[in-house]
Amino acid sequence: MQEQYRPEEIESKVQLHWDEKRTFEVTEDESKEKYYCLSMLPYPSGRLHMGHVRNYTIGDVIARYQRMLGKNVLQPIGWDAFGLPAEGAAVKNNTAPAPWTYDNIAYMKNQLKMLGFGYDWSRELATCTPEYYRWEQKFFTELYKKGLVYKKTSAVNWCPNDQTVLANEQVIDGCCWRCDTKVERKEIPQWFIKITAYADELLNDLDKLDHWPDTVKTMQRNWIGRSEGVEITFNVNDYDNTLTVYTTRPDTFMGCTYLAVAAGHPLAQKAAENNPELAAFIDECRNTKVAEAEMATMEKKGVDTGFKAVHPLTGEEIPVWAANFVLMEYGTGAVMAVPGHDQRDYEFASKYGLNIKPVILAADGSEPDLSQQALTEKGVLFNSGEFNGLDHEAAFNAIADKLTAMGVGERKVNYRLRDWGVSRQRYWGAPIPMVTLEDGTVMPTPDDQLPVILPEDVVMDGITSPIKADPEWAKTTVNGMPALRETDTFDTFMESSWYYARYTCPEYKEGMLDSEAANYWLPVDIYIGGIEHAIMHLLYFRFFHKLMRDAGMVNSDEPAKQLLCQGMVLADAFYYVGENGERNWVSPVDAIVERDEKGRIVKAKDAAGHELVYTGMSKMSKSKNNGIDPQVMVERYGADTVRLFMMFASPADMTLEWQESGVEGANRFLKRVWKLVYEHTAKGDVAALNVDALTEDQKALRRDVHKTIAKVTDDIGRRQTFNTAIAAIMELMNKLAKAPTDGEQDRALMQEALLAVVRMLNPFTPHICFTLWQELKGEGDIDNAPWPVADEKAMVEDSTLVVVQVNGKVRAKITVPVDATEEQVRERAGQEHLVAKYLDGVTVRKVIYVPGKLLNLVVG
């Protein structure tokens, strides 16, 4: 064994061994308990970043640990390979998205191997290949036949200059990112999947997910947004149709003083025919993209349509306004306004001088003061005719019942969740498998024409999708009739909604899933990824699983038993102010810093001499130029060091602060482990350990070894506090480094301890452990070695520490045998000088003894 720890030599050798032996390839095995460990698959952007490394290290630690417990562990990896960034990169680099993507995959695959992750590479998949997306296309046609897919018009961002649809992130300050033309909102037909048909199940089954973070479940509950309320119909004077609104507060209905409709509502459109002000307002709304997050903060505007609706219970006429805070795609595109008891309605009514009518008493029973704001709390009704004096619940039911009896109301359950729009007017995605026949009939692409292959050899102009620009691509024949293919592609969330299931049978040719393999491996035992995916991906992931279950492919209700959301990776961020006042961000690698005695940064400059402003730790990002390249760190310290630091520096679900000093510390620790094994093995063969012949000191050291095994097992397996597991191993290493190694049993005990340490470290630092296991002559490869088991007998304490008090004040701490009697403890306490001096010449009036813990002598 060489004396120096040289990761650059051992890591590549061990990785080659894993490749040649196919160590981590697995198949279904009914005789073994399975464990499916999955990290969210990466987008092949070109290089791994530290966020990836953290995510995949956590997954690999768990997978290797479970493997050592004797389970059949599946840990696959693949590539979420479709998406908009590839189009931009292709234009910039004068290539096509496909070669750019495949080059990135090859590069990043090598980076993953360099980090030593134990993946089953035989199951690797890329979502941009027809072998993958053909099954997604087939599944979509099946959903269409079941009535779970439909087409309707929906608003998109449209650049009139480029004649193209823009993704939200391509709209900068209301203008096209490419040509700076003002972006318009345009209604175009798009495909939707009915996720709302599963809303109740998606909501209720959150209660089954005991091992998902509460934050994620709460976010999904709010996103689904189930509410119970009443749908109310209003007659409108001089208008052919009625208006329908939905409210969760029918108890406030007697305070409804106006209605508001979306700018795109047919009533607003009709009113605009003779109202230029309204027509201009509708135009303004049409070209304003409004995300829900912006709705709360934007200025509320509106125009009176001139129409009057009739309040069904009071018979009063109330005005109908067009307002920018009502969206056509939400609910009915019309809302009732109760400005006395809703703050948004209050602000709008105050701005435009509309009637504000209070109908709920304040908590003290007085009439509410509405001079500054609405009263939004629930309470007792007044000013409400026959409903006066009713509390919230009674009023809700009474008003709902009356409206229902009159035929103008109906109790309804509503959801905030909208159906999933899966059409994207982009090129680099899976083609949507639908066709339109010459006679206008729309139908799914027949099975014998699947997959609809996306051509990869294309020229990108950065404006129009190549499959939209080429009229020939869309032409096909169905049932002998000319037809045109759909030229939109799927939302890339489609591919990432079912990849986890395809990993169980990536070569299967007969269908989307081989049910036998899928049901052996599924559900996923632990799924690891960022909390930013809480509502979109993780909701679609759950939805798709239920769709596949209902298609008979899987027999579980949920895709993953446990979800672990790893924290972000932070790094120092620095900038200097340029000549034009702009911020120039400088990589922390290039910052020369001065620190105070507490290690805090007090001054910084770069190599060019710029004084740098230190903004603290923030998420590693391109915008702040504070990302640290994992590859550079692996080349400098080795993969094991980077992995160990990642798992030690912070709990897995908390933010991690990147500190190179911490990386150096992890590296020093691994050098110490190497040195101890080197010194131990240099002394030659080791005798067998005789546990019955150990001295007290040897027993104490062996007790520490086995207590550490017990703690590390609990920390990794149950608590998933990996940082405390590593801390416990480090503490044990400090004791081993000081332990005597001269005697035969000293060395036998050291052998037992080092074999345990190397196995406990193996999930974290597999390359060094693989090598040290061989040097220690462990049995077989460490990858097939069992996890160490704590010896209960070894952990039993022979002695215990008893606190001795005189009149309640601590005077000594004594070590006594665990089976010592009260008399023996008193006798031993009396031998302590500090106790004896307080007992001299006094009478012991009372003795309080808590066996093995406390002796209190009361004297007087």
Swiss-Prot record:
A motif ('KMSKS' region) lies at residues 619-623. A motif ('HIGH' region) lies at residues 42-52. Its EC number is 6.1.1.4. GO terms for biological process: leucyl-tRNA aminoacylation. Keywords: Aminoacyl-tRNA synthetase, ATP-binding, Cytoplasm, Ligase, Nucleotide-binding, Protein biosynthesis. ATP binds at residue 622. It is an enzyme of class 6 (ligase). InterPro entries: aa-tRNA-synth_I_CS, aa-tRNA-synth_Ia, Leu-tRNA-ligase, Leu_tRNA-synth_edit, M/V/L/I-tRNA-synth_anticd-bd, Methionyl/Leucyl_tRNA_Synth, Rossmann-like_a/b/a_fold, tRNAsynth_Ia_anticodon-bd. It is found in: Cytoplasm. GO terms for molecular function: aminoacyl-tRNA deacylase activity; ATP binding; leucine-tRNA ligase activity. It comes from Escherichia coli (strain 55989 / EAEC). The keyword ATP-binding applies. This is Leucine--tRNA ligase. It holds the Pfam family tRNA-synt_1g. It comes from the Bacteria. CDD domains: Anticodon_Ia_Leu_BEm, LeuRS_core. Belongs to the class-I aminoacyl-tRNA synthetase family. Transmembrane segments: none annotated. GO terms for cellular component: cytosol. It catalyses: tRNA(Leu) + L-leucine + ATP = L-leucyl-tRNA(Leu) + AMP + diphosphate.
